[in-house]
């Protein structure tokens, strides 16, 4: 089976989310949790941030000697040397690919930047680093510019090109066409870096792989600037395996704990319907669905909850039917007759409407006691 590398950037791009700032202990713990989940390649920081960030990167390196670690650098000799001194495996050297960024960010012509790029690739090689060229804002760059960058990278040589949809403007069809065009002029590795401004980062990531990308950037919980990055720890990784038939090496059962760790460190809530890891994604209420699930657990689930170390859960609410009421109470040790089910169902529906949620087990017991228990029988007597 073909393998695609997940190069997670939670600790670099993910931490660029407004308000997200990991302590040293959190950064190390997240790196360890990523590694335990089978995500062994990660972009761990930016040396340009200063001594504290450098110390954090150094500690991650010490704790994970077998992980494949990358730093993000500008075209700057000091930052590249700092990365080498830290024992990092890869350096991503960023170059503004679009006319807009070159004009307003660096104010230098492409020809000058390409000369410098070749020099910095050579420097990184002499320091024992593998080189990825980060084509920043590639989705707004011309094909001619990307070909020129690829030619310099090929001759230097660099090992990987990162295609960054920096402002998240791509759709899957354009992504596939762009990566395919890049593959025509570049024989090395291609890494897709997708942002989620239009809600298509995961789809664009899969499209890139289908067109020839060999690695993808991801973040836990989809953290990142603006609308975030591709959350490949969940739908992207599983989508790569299920939809494209490629191997990622991700241990999916470890992902809920990883997500919880990052959520706590980032002070972000996990949406209850977040794919794969949300509290409600393996929870069923609808009467038709529950009736089928009670007979066959795969009838309304394409993903086995056990893959994530979880199990499916039945709850009662406004859309529940009689079989669901009977099934849930049976799991609680209550064996209902038809008359009791008919009494309970409207009360459960009223509860859901009034409280805007499903009743918890103890609340179901209270409803049962009120309507069907011995006290209710005595009241009627």
Curated annotation (Swiss-Prot):
Domain Pyruvate carboxyltransferase: 4-256
Keyword set, alphabetical order: Nitrogen fixation, Transferase
Catalyzed reactions: acetyl-CoA + 2-oxoglutarate + H2O = (2R)-homocitrate + CoA + H(+)
Stored InterPro entries: AIPM/Hcit_synth_CS, Aldolase_TIM, LeuA/HCS_post-cat, NifV/FrbC, PYR_CT
A Pfam family it matches: HMGL-like
PROSITE patterns xrefs: AIPM_HOMOCIT_SYNTH_1, AIPM_HOMOCIT_SYNTH_2, PYR_CT
Molecular function GO labels: homocitrate synthase activity
GO biological process: biosynthetic process; carboxylic acid metabolic process; nitrogen fixation
Top-level division of the source organism's lineage: Bacteria
Protein EC: 2.3.3.14
The protein's enzyme class: transferase
Function (record text): This protein is a Fe-Mo-cofactor biosynthetic component.
Entry's family note: Belongs to the alpha-IPM synthase/homocitrate synthase family.
Family matches, as NCBIfam families: nifV_homocitr (TIGR02660)
Protein name per its UniProtKB record: Homocitrate synthase
Protein's organism: Klebsiella pneumoniae
Protein encoded by which gene: nifV
């Amino acid at each position: 089976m073909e393998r695609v590398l997940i190069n997670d950037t939670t600790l670099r791009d993910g931490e660029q989310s407004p308000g997200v700032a990991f302590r040293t202990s959190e950064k190390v713990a997240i790196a360890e949790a990523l590694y335990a989940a089978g995500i062994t390649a990660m972009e761990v920081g930016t040396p340009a941030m200063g001594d504290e960030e450098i110390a954090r990167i150094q500690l991650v390196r010490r704790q994970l000697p077998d992980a494949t670690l990358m730093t993000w650098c500008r075209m700057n000799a000091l930052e590249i040397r700092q990365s080498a001194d830290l024992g990092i495996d890869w350096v991503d050297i960023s170059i503004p690919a679009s006319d807009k960024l070159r004009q307003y960010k660096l104010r230098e012509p492409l020809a000058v930047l390409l000369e410098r790029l070749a020099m910095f690739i050579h420097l990184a090689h002499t320091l024992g680093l593998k080189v990825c060229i980060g084509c920043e804002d590639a989705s707004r760059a011309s094909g001619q510019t990307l070909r020129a960058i690829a030619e310099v990278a090929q001759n230097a040589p660099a090992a990987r090109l990162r295609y960054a949809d920096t402002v998240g403007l791509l759709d899957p069809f354009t992504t596939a066409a762009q990566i395919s065009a890049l593959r025509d002029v570049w024989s090395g590795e291609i890494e897709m870096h997708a942002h989620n401004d239009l809600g298509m980062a995961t789809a664009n990531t899969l499209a890139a792989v289908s067109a020839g990308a060999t690695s993808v950037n991801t973040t836990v919980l989809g953290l990142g600037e603006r609308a975030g990055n591709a959350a490949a720890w969940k739908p992207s990784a599983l989508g790569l395996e299920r939809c494209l038939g490629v191997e990622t090496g991700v241990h999916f059962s470890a992902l809920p704990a990883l997500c919880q760790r990052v959520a706590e460190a980032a002070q972000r809530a996990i949406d209850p319907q977040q794919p794969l890891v949300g509290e409600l994604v393996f929870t069923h209420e609808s009467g038709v669905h529950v009736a089928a699930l009670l007979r066959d657990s795969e009838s309304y689930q394409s993903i086995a909850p056990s893959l994530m170390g979880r199990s499916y859960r039945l709850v009662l609410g406004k859309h529940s039917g009689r079989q669901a009421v009977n099934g849930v109470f049976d799991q609680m040790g209550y064996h209902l007759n038809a008359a009791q089910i008919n009494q309970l169902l409207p009360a459960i529906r009223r509860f859901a409407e009034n409280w805007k949620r499903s009743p918890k087990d103890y609340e179901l017991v209270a409803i049962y006691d009120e309507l069907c228990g011995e006290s209710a029988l005595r009241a009627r007597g």
